[in-house]
Amino acid sequence: MATGARPRERIKARCAQGRPGFLLCALSPCRVRLQGRSGAASLGGCLGRRVTESMPVFRVSRQVACWMLQSPACGCRASVLPSRLLGTSPRQIPMDANFHSTSFSEADQQRVLITGGLGQLGVGLASFLRKRFGKDNVILSDIRKPPEHVFLSGPFIYSDILDYKNLREIVVNNRITWLFHYSALLSAVGEANVSLARAVNITGLHNVLDVAAEHGLRLFVPSTIGAFGPTSPRNPTPDLCIQRPRTIYGVSKVHAELMGEYYYYRYGLDFRCLRYPGIISADSQPGGGTTDYAVQIFHEAVKNGRFECNLKPDTRLPMMYIDDCLRATLEVMEAPAESLSMRTYNISAMSFTPAELAQEVLKHIPELQVTYNVDPVRQAIADSWPMNFDDSNARKDWGWKHDFDLPELVTTMLNFHGSESRVAQAN
């Protein structure tokens, strides 16, 4: 290299040869003393403090520090910040910081962690993903002890999302690449315990976001029809519109959507989110949500032949069978990044009222007795939610298409609950 080459080029050449020739302490919190002929000068926590500009060592060191922060060794320019700076969280990183991270190619075998795994969706999602990635590559976690069949079905560990250190240890020790964050208190339960809902749904989310950003994970956080409020368009509700929910559950989900989008733009976090409608699943008990009447009716119809609904018979809400929900979740996670025009999508399959659902069930179990005892809290929540979702962006961007409509849903649910004898008698 010519002796007249600029310092930046000379530094790059020397670093490429493995002999930078000096010690950098630019990122150290300690203070460094630089001794020159003009006397001692102090250098604080970051390069750029006032130091005698005529000192050649300082000028070269500052250029190297800038080059190291902006240009990773692999030669590509880093534009995102997926990791913490010396143990600090993304919330504490300087605004002008840039880092380079290792990303996982689509061909790599994913290592998956599911938080809140013993809720309505976690067990089914684990089973679904294990068929795709292998039994040992999908780890279910929760703070509760799992039933024996869940424990024996694949890896299960204790995980408290409010314990950041525990969460970080799990991600590191198990080489996690995808994280599905299902820990949350649902709508009606959250209203009964706002402080706990705030801790789980918001503080827990912050921990998950930080861990995912630090380790370059692909993160999925479900949202909900509850993220909308009474001032939102209800029929249909588009992806982008005013969102003013009136439950702590809804507020926390809007917060999750916006924080995930912020981390995507600010730190490069691969955040993906679906707004679920009411999800109907056969193999789980109702979890305290406003739409859980649509699950409870099948349990009660088969067990007792009677069902008391806590919503008005004409309350229309968007719904989806769990198989469609799980498939949509995997499809959006596997979608190429360039195909996604937004970070949060509506998805939908059907929309019905309690009366319409009961009428369809009566086709199979004519002796079913349905009564209505309206819960004013749940009814107020339902009246503030969408009646129909506009999911045209999901269908256009990554090819979403549902399989189950109301007749298929009812038949599948009743068959699962062992109602074949009742169906045969009715026929």
Place the predicted regions along the sequence by residue.
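Active-site Tyr-X1-5-Lys
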Residues: 246-272
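C-terminal substrate-binding subdomain of Rossmann-fold SDR/epimerase-dehydratase oxidoreductases
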Residues: 310-313, 317-427
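Amphipathic terminal alpha-helices
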Residues: 69, 74-77, 83-106, 111, ...
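Glycine/proline-rich active-site loop of Rossmann-fold NAD(P)-dependent oxidoreductases
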Residues: 254, 267, 279-295, 310, ...
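Flexible, glycine-rich beta-alpha linker
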Residues: 228-229, 244-247, 272-291
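Conserved Rossmann-fold NAD(P)-dependent oxidoreductase catalytic core, especially the SDR/UDP-sugar
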Residues: 175, 181, 199, 206-248
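NAD(P)H-binding glycine-rich loop region in Rossmannoid oxidoreductase-like domains
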Residues: 161-200
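N-terminal Rossmann NAD(P)H-binding glycine-rich loop of SDR-like oxidoreductase domains
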Residues: 111-131
